[in-house]
């Protein structure tokens, strides 16, 4: 079976870290016997090339110096900061449309799988209709945000959805947004971690949390929101045997709280920094990895908190500045320290995960209405053996079942964040139970074997019809 994968981004060279989940997806499809070609835009004149033995067809849409609409940053963000880039949208669609026709005429794929359907559904539609090739549209959430900004996008998406033979969404949250546009059947098809397999990285540790024992068995048969019972039964554990607890973490001198991600509004980092007010400095440390537009603003917020920590009367200062002191009754006299690491090498990032005690994603619905479509970073943190604290927004509840595979808290609630960290720090048994639940959740819903098996079932059904 042949599948043409279309997207706005694909690795430009072997070491490129762009869309690792899509690259991993392609690798697993090939491993399952599917022939793959990729269609993606050029970047600064980049010609067609091969990555991991997969041919990547690059379509040109502007002079080389202007071909910066995609890669390194999302196209919507780029167009917002550089409005002239919107002029490239028309040649982007036209040239992608032509290249798609050429590939399909010559290669004749059995299925076209288009990620980010606006605008890639329209790049694929001509070839799909002309050569009678089934079209799969794959939504990741970002394209749906455009509807709030540009009302004319909704009818275009509604039409495109109606032309597709199958629609994938990365979470039940995204699926609900799609159905609000057009009431069609939507397959929830999340993407798994891009980390190496559990067996490849597992090692025995003597300095782990007390009470954490590898090889703990878990119950089976729980109903799942992301898959039918049949699909759940077909999703095999990544190690091929009884689910095991992930890598265990040492007890540090301080309870280390780790955030990894872009410093943008919807990540809710400001509320994590506020949570430090409720965490004593002798017990807790917050480590913020990554960078972005809000980095300097967040550093200033943390620096102000640090100055308060250094003064004798910081508690009174904080209480006098807030409108509702009742909610700040738990403010610590010496708040937890906050460390910004910047962007890290893979080795340094791995060490951050290895020495952390909990992973946090304090996501919010931002001022643009955007939020987490799924939260793959949570799956990766689970795989690496970290208990999870995350906000109850977007697609996050598909990954984190409150009290089972992690702790969910209300968005924009620093007190709830701090309380969750304190619970985990004080209760190793709770951590053990959450890690066991996380392992089960991953094995049931987020293993690549299960994800790819379900995708191929859809491909085969469409090609037969």
Predicted regions and their residues:
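A short, well-ordered alpha-helix in the C-terminal region of glycosyltransferases
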Residues: 416, 423, 430-445, 454-457, ...
